Amino acid sequence: MRVLFTGAECAPFFKTGGLGDVLGSLPNQLAKEGVDVGVVLPLYQDLPEKYRKNLKYQGNFIVPVGWRNQYCGIFTLKLNGVNYFFIDNEYYFKRPGIYGYYDDGERYAYFQQAVIMMMERFDFIPDVLHCNDYHTAFIPFLLHEKWGFVDAYKGIKTILTIHNLEFQGKYNAKTLPDFFGMNYDWFDSGIVRMDNDVNWMKTGILYADRVTTVSPSYAREIQTVEFGQGLDAILRMCSHKLTGILNGIDFEKYNPKTDPVIKKNYDVYHLHHKSKDKIALQKELDLPIKPNIPLIGMVSRLTAQKGCQLLLDELDNILQFNVQIVILGNGDPYYEHRLMEIAERYPDKLKVILAFDVKLAQRIYAGADSFLMPSAFEPCGLSQLIALRYGTLPIVHEIGGLADTVWVYDETTNEGTGFGFKEFSGYQMVQAIKKMLALYQQKNNWLKIQKIAMKSDFSWKNSADKYKWMYGELIG
């Protein structure tokens, strides 16, 4: 079985969010299980030198982008059993960062066509071509309608994974001829059109053999008006081929027993050592050293989607409890400013670090008692999975992947892995925090829940097994 992944980002080369984590982990796990795996990526300027120096040049060809003939060089790298192909074009990709350029539409139109043309030229014809998010969502359509005449491509099955439906790739109708050399008939017929734009995501949903998203709950939610981002009717129409498969986390990387950046390593059988990480975190952030005070951590982009307004509305009230809170992240300047203002008023209770700091994040996962994740919507979420792995009990809005991965504590059975609130309101969030604080005082019960949380299996093996089954079903 040969599977070719493609997307706009992939750890460890370049990553801005969950898409990069998935493309950095799922192919690796599949390779461990004997699948012949490739990943095609743009060769961005920011590729770290330790990888760039090992790239092997394989050749080049021309990609027509409308009336323009654009160079495409192919470089390869084999890492952890995965074949990586890098699409080289300095005009499109020799720039800082990944996204946010005025010509992103043209850049990823070029990239998608380069991916398709590369497969035959460099003899990597997959059984399954696995596309990710809008940057590659037009590929199933192009493969079928523009390159359908290529015999080598006729057996390829396509999967489109939606990591975040908010971003859809909406472009003017003139981009059909200008980027793809295709006529307006496809637009006029409505096949690629949505709200008078070409919509790559909508088209990919229609043309892909299977559509997946990153949790079962999110797969259901995006078929509703509330969460469907205008594509709910299309997704309901395609519900027969829509599946939610949870993301995983790297159990080797996120392991409190071996994590090199935390103060004291621990596991489910030596949870008493976790308190040393808490004290170390309090020292590092200049909080009063109080091992018995509940410490809530939050590692997040500071945006409305992540529930920051909800948090701001209730933060003064929460800080009246006997609690310490540590928030790490950056994002919307308004939320950054407001959080810093509140932190100045509560120097012994609240620390806000406006940064993206992977090592400090690890120390927060290890040192906190509980982890707050009040997202307005969350396709899957990785932070709550890491928190569970570290025995740091999540407090979550029961939505999307958060609902699928956090087993909300039941006081009658004394079982669960965290705390939740169904209604997206400040009052309900505070009630969930109060339940956490009450359980924290019951040390034996708290320890029991921590152990259940740490034994939860959200490794990539579970996800990879589900995808392998889907690939097998597709190719027969």
Swiss-Prot record:
The keyword Transferase applies. InterPro entries: Glyco_trans_1 (IPR001296), GS/SS (IPR011835), Starch_synth_cat_dom (IPR013534). ADP-alpha-D-glucose binds at residue 15. It catalyses: [(1->4)-alpha-D-glucosyl](n) + ADP-alpha-D-glucose = [(1->4)-alpha-D-glucosyl](n+1) + ADP + H(+). This is Glycogen synthase. Belongs to the glycosyltransferase 1 family. Bacterial/plant glycogen synthase subfamily. One of its GO terms (molecular function) is alpha-1,4-glucan glucosyltransferase (ADP-glucose donor) activity. The keyword Ribosomal protein does not apply. SUPFAM superfamilies: UDP-Glycosyltransferase/glycogen phosphorylase (SSF53756). Pathway: Glycan biosynthesis; glycogen biosynthesis. It comes from Lactobacillus acidophilus (strain ATCC 700396 / NCK56 / N2 / NCFM).
